[in-house]
Amino acid sequence: MVEVCQEFLEIVKYICASKYDFTMWTDKFNGNVGIYINADNKAVDICQYMSPISDGSYIPIGLNIMYKNNGTKTYEEGGNAKERWEEIVNFLQK
């Protein structure tokens, strides 16, 4: 089981309640998890960055939101999920 930060979980809830198609993904090499949204000709990849700890498990350390053709924004853990979701929707609706 992978532990994720509250902000990531809240963004996933917004996505699930939206009209957007999405795909969940995991990277078994480094423990990262994410969700990919593809809407028309635009895409957003939201990655929950993980850091390994001594017992071999991972802890969440931040979010990376990649906007296709519009750059990447990286956030430390503990941000505002509602604001992040509004940024994502604004990008997808432009």
Where are these regions (language model features)?
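Negatively charged, low-complexity tracts enriched in Asp/Glu with abundant Ser/Thr
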Residues: 1-39, 68-74
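General N-terminal targeting signals
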Residues: 21, 52, 91-92
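Residue-level detector of alpha-helical secondary structure
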Residues: 9, 13-16, 82, 86-89, ...
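Intrinsically disordered, low-complexity regulatory segments enriched in Ser/Thr/Pro
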Residues: 42-83
